[in-house]
Curated annotation (Swiss-Prot):
The lineage of its organism: Bacteria, Pseudomonadati, Pseudomonadota, Alphaproteobacteria, Hyphomicrobiales. It comes from Bartonella henselae (strain ATCC 49882 / DSM 28221 / CCUG 30454 / Houston 1) (Rochalimaea henselae). Specifically methylates the N4 position of cytidine in position 1402 (C1402) of 16S rRNA. It catalyses: cytidine(1402) in 16S rRNA + S-adenosyl-L-methionine = N(4)-methylcytidine(1402) in 16S rRNA + S-adenosyl-L-homocysteine + H(+). Signal peptide: none annotated. This is Ribosomal RNA small subunit methyltransferase H. PANTHER family: 12S RRNA N4-METHYLCYTIDINE METHYLTRANSFERASE, S-ADENOSYL-METHYLTRANSFERASE MRAW. Gene3D superfamilies: Putative methyltransferase TM0872, insert domain, Vaccinia Virus protein VP39. It holds the Pfam family Methyltransf_5.
Length: 346
């Protein structure tokens, strides 16, 4: 079935409660997502990362029934108008997508996961996700638990360095961690702009350099605060449990660490052996997925021009087989261990 994407694109301009015009979130790789999950008419789909509702709206416009989850209470509040608009085909649930198998009573036709921070969260300075706008050093998606400020002001430098190195793939992880530990003794880091500036002064920035030197540190802190790696791993296993045979799992990731996890999952679940320096070779098991589009799908030139945030996005899709679910072993991903925040509390 062909999809007329002009009908299903999210509207770009909306009115806020104050009557001001604002731009609606543009979901990345929307066309490949819709094409990869078809047929959608009457399909039961889980959108595990509702965010600003871009994918959910497009899925609903294509005729699907959607259960959408998000751990961010702000996203849930903002999404109520969409629930009213598409009642009864949309159910909105506050919760982590790692628990998506707890919100459905029967198998579903598709699951879509858009990993990482949403544009809505990035654009709100008070949420503290971005250094583009100064705000409190927060970064909590669910708005509960410890903040990024707690992490940088309490963890030892070697623990910080490990977080920056593993979760942010930051080459200057140790230097930055030592600087943070030394500086916070005089004045704690409480603002995004303060931390970003301190990193820029330490590392330096060449004229015309596109990527800010604090980018990878902010990425690492956000991933750590929200346990995004654990969430992704558990979410992949949960999707395996809820998809019916022939059902499709689509995952959009934005950096190499997440993409490697998704790739390893589909490789292992398709019957391929997986190698890692962290664990012995995993024996082949009955395939529960077969992946589509080897190497994944990235944004084309047109989308890159329209939505620069799609630059680093990659979509991977797997089709569920009839095989029984396999054991949910976190070792499959070959991840190095990082200390929990409990050791950093006063």
């Amino acid at each position: 079935m062909a999809i007329d994407l002009k009908k299903h694109k999210s509207r770009r301009i909306i009115l806020t409660k104050q009557g001001k015009r604002t731009e609606r979130h543009i979901p990345v790789l929307l066309q490949p997502v819709l094409a990869g999950l078809i047929p959608l008419v009457g399909a039961k789909v889980i959108d595990g990362t509702f965010g600003a509702g871009g994918y959910t709206r497009a899925l609903l416009n294509a005729g699907a029934q959607v259960i959408a989850l998000d751990r961010d209470p702000h996203a849930i509040r903002e999404g109520q108008s969409l629930v009213d608009e598409f009642f009864p085909r949309l159910r909105l649930v506050q919760g982590n997508f790692s628990q998506l198998d707890c919100v459905v009573e029967e198998k579903v036709d598709a699951v879509i996961l858009d990993i990482g921070v949403s544009s809505m969260q990035l654009d709100e300075a008070e949420r503290g996700f971005s250094f583009q706008k100064d705000g409190p050093l927060d970064m909590r998606m669910a708005q509960t638990g410890f903040t990024a400020a707690d992490v940088v002001n309490r963890l030892k430098s070697d623990e910080l360095a490990r977080i920056f190195k593993i979760l942010g793939e930051e080459r200057y992880a140790r230097r930055i961690a030592r600087m943070i530990e030394k500086r916070r003794c005089v004045q704690p880091f409480l603002r995004t702009g303060d931390l970003a500036h301190a990193i820029e002064v330490l590392v330096g920035r060449k004229s015309g350099e596109r990527i800010h030197p604090a980018t990878r540190v902010f990425q690492a802190l956000r991933i750590y605060v929200n346990d995004e790696i654990g969430e992704l791993a558990r979410g992949l296993f949960a999707a395996e449990r809820v998809l019916k045979p022939g059902g499709r799992l689509g995952v959009v990731s934005f950096h190499s660490l997440e993409d490697r996890m998704v790739k390893r999952f589909f490789s292992a679940r398709s019957g391929e052996s997986v190698r890692s320096r962290y664990l012995p070779e995993i024996e082949m098991a009955p395939a529960t997925f077969f992946p589509l589009f080897k190497g994944g799908i990235t944004a084309n030139k047109e989308e890159l021009e329209r939505n620069p945030r799609s630059r680093s996005a990659r979509l991977r899709i797997g089709v569920r087989t009839e095989a029984e679910c396999l054991f949910a072993d976190m070792k499959l991903f070959g991840l190095a261990k990082i200390a929990s925040f409990e050791g950093g509390k006063k």
